[in-house]
A protein has these predicted regions:
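HotDog/MaoC-like acyl-thioester-processing domains
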Residues: 1-28, 113-115, 126-184
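Hydrophobic beta-strand-centered segment that forms part of the acyl-chain substrate-binding groove
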Residues: 3-6, 14, 87-120, 147
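Catalytic strand-loop segment that frames the active site of acyl-thioester-processing enzymes
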Residues: 31-76
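A generic structural signal for short beta-strands and their flanking turns/coil linkers
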Residues: 32-33, 45-47, 57-61, 101-105, ...
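Short capping/connector residues at structural and topological boundaries
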Residues: 41-44, 80, 114, 154
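Short beta-strand micro-motifs enriched in acidic
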Residues: 52-54, 124-128
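Residue-level recognition of well-ordered beta-strand positions that form the cores
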Residues: 62-64, 106-108, 122-124, 138-140, ...
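A short, contiguous structural element within a folded domain that forms the immediate neighborhood
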Residues: 68-78, 83-95
């Protein structure tokens, strides 16, 4: 993965700390919003990522490239692959039990991904510095140890729930996450 300095953790960045209430190893992670294109179960043409944390520090997920996800005939659209990387990385910061948003996403496309292929995704955190999380992900064709088709490095920024209330739909947030407090 070719990373810029913006997605490389600074020397003082530390590993993520275990957070009380974070999903335990082996936990299947639920969708954060039913209509999310990446993980939502209610989105008609979404990726429908099914994710879990095998060890409490990484996230693994799969999705099968469908007809609605193609760019060139019978090949996954690069933007869809970038979305898959963004989503699995976003699910990995879910382990910190704090809201984050994508600040930067760098994606390397290594192999074409045909329609009908199951892409096996894995994401992990390389370090945290203040409100910034430095993360990576990879997508492998056909199996968890299959050939790497796509890699990503990302910078995610911690925000408060007020961010989503201000820029999104507060009523939808309250329905999906009644336990979150906005502007407590």
């Amino acid at each position: 993965m070719t990373r810029s300095s913006l997605t490389t953790p600074p020397p003082h960045a530390g590993p993520p700390e275990a957070v009380p209430g974070a999903p335990a190893p082996g936990t299947v992670l639920s969708s954060h919003y039913g209509q999310c294109f990446g993980c939502g179960t209610e989105h008609p043409t979404g990726l429908h990522l099914k994710a879990r944390t095998p060890d409490g520090t990484t996230v693994e997920a799969e999705f099968t490239v469908g007809e609605a996800h193609q760019g060139a005939p019978k090949l996954a659209h690069g933007g869809v692959l970038a979305t898959a990387m963004d989503e699995v990385i976003g699910m990995s910061v879910y382990l910190f039990r704090k809201p984050y948003v994508t600040g930067r996403l760098e994606t390397d496309y290594l192999l074409p991904v045909p329609v009908g292929t199951t892409l096996h995704l894995r994401a992990w955190c390389n370090g945290i510095a203040g409100r910034k999380a430095y993360l990576e992900a990879e997508g492998r064709i056909g199996a968890p140890d299959g050939p790497v088709a796509v890699r990503a490095a990302a910078l995610f920024i911690e925000v408060n729930m007020e961010h989503f209330a201000k820029h999104g739909d507060l009523a939808a947030i309250e329905v999906e996450h009644p336990d979150y407090e906005v502007n407590p």
